[in-house]
Amino acid sequence: MVPQTANMNEVIDKIDMSLDDIIKLNKEQQNKATFNGGARTNSFQWFQNKWGSRQATDNGIQGRKNGMFGVKTGLALRKMNSWKGVSPLNRPPLSLRNSEGQWSPFRRRTNLSRRLGFVPSLKRNYFHSSYAQASTFRRGLRTNQQRDQRQATYFQKRGLKVQATMDMEQLEEFPELKRAHPWRTSMNSGGILTVSIDNPTAALLPSTRLPRPTLPFLLKKEGSEPKIPKGVPLDFDINSVVKQTGITLNERFKILKEQRLSQSMSKGSRFVTVG
């Protein structure tokens, strides 16, 4: 880096000075610059960029600046164009780079469909079609059916019978109701709710006095004898396993000892067993 000719004399003077003197001289020049209202002794011109950070121009630096290596295309090229004229040391942080002012043209392009109010045809025509009306009608009909079913089961567990009926005029007005059972649904307050309670003290009809026939699987077959399970009869004879004698264990072991002694004496063994 080569300094300008205007500052050449100052550089030559500083060569002959000691390090302490150079530091003192630089401090004095800085104090004078701040006292004079921002006058700079060096050749750099300072200004404040749009992100609020200070940036120095390279007027005092002579020589050729090297360009960017490689070929940038696409999004990388757009980023480079947005940073054009900004030093790499003074570029804004990522939080400011992604602000509204940085990518406003690209965001405007992506949000174009939202601003113009483009909606898919299926979603746009859904509420204006007969399918939406029929589906919402079926949904309300289904909730009413479920409510009536829950009410019927509640009464049935407590010994009550529930039956909800509808007028025929209502069925003609809503043809969708013909598919469902009319006794389950009641769409308005004109429905009739019939509740029947069992009364044992009331007079029974002749048809109800007859006893109910027993179910066929509950009837027992007459004359059925218990079956003998098939198998081989097991006769266990304890005498075949062991002979019952009146000899005690001590007598039995004594006999065995005597047998061993007699066998050893007959063979002429050198070992003598002491009983």
Swiss-Prot record:
Presence of the UniProt keyword Metal-binding in the record: no
Pfam family, one: FYTT
Residue interval(s) of motif UAP56-binding motif: 11-29
GO biological process: mRNA export from nucleus
Keyword Endoplasmic reticulum included in the entry's annotation: no
Compartment(s) of residence: Nucleus, Nucleoplasm; Nucleus speckle
GO terms assigned for molecular function: mRNA binding
Predominant location: nucleus
UniProt record similarity statement: Belongs to the UIF family.
Protein name: UAP56-interacting factor
Organism: Aquarana catesbeiana (American bullfrog)
